[in-house]
């Protein structure tokens, strides 16, 4: 029960898809010679999101709550100031209109109080108040976010029953984030309950159909593992590829996609695409991908051998105490020249991961390995 509550003490907020720039340590020139890779750079994270993402290692209660549903205020506007010739400040007007029932203002005020934006001091109780007002208008986004506040005890006492009720209502109204939140809740605690598993699968499917990329990966992974449904690698490849590419760039999707390409499951075996997918996940700091990519470059079987990069990658993984990484790194020492070792050390030392915004959101909200939600609920058939 303690583990159940600890895992669930997270903020299931809807998120806004903004994406971080790729790193260039493991660049095309270093890894695959002249092979080019499309950039996933879109735009920089806004100030409020940067504030929450700095706490990535320990997780953040605030995740990436959805932005205000309107453009009422710019990110730098000081809304408490009264303009010349005006009777009230933008803030006073927004409060008045929120009290008069304006959903737009209720959502914006809830967001600004939660983040302490636009000249307002952060006030969790007021954030809760305005999201509650918006939720009473049956707005699914407000319901989902209010459920998150109840779930985490932000601005109010924790109330799991109210949180789940709000998530369920928001899901019924088509909110893909609420459906996703419910699915993860059903899979928390590794109950291995076929009824809960089926509900989770259906919710992943519902959320994916609404365009949620996290749900798309989970649905693909369910087909990959044979979770609730029979194993179907073609379906797995279809969904996982979408979650790995485009603007989503989910690191775990890239990792599994690389495995599919390596083994030729659901698609034609393609080692170049496998290496490219491993690299993409490694650039986001995915330690499994870093270790697998190191193995690939050390072996030199599916891509040209590169002991410098293999050593650097093992070193990066070893610094995170990844099993066998230090041993594999040390085994390469005897095969490398001093200059190569120096280059490898510098490469590892300069490494800085650059997770996509969606990857950061997943890590902050659901953890660093969301595949475990399915893996830990797999039911092994007793039939022989």
Regions found by a protein language model. Name each.
Residues 1-22:
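Classical Sec-dependent N-terminal signal peptides that target proteins to the secretory pathway
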Residues 20-69:
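N-terminal propeptides/low-complexity segments immediately following signal peptides
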Residues 80-115:
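N-terminal segments that cap or nucleate solenoid repeat domains
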Residues 84-92, 120-130, 157-166, 192-203, ...:
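Structural signature of tandem alpha-helical TPR/SEL1-like repeats
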Residues 97, 133-134, 169-170, 206-207, ...:
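Canonical positions in the second alpha-helix
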Residues 99-102, 116-117, 136-139, 152-154, ...:
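Short helix-capping/linker turns of helical repeat alpha-solenoids
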Residues 108-115, 120, 145-152, 179-189, ...:
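Hydrophobic face of amphipathic alpha-helices that form TPR/SEL1-like repeat modules
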Residues 324-384:
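Terminal, low-structured helical/coil segments at or just beyond the last alpha-helical repeat
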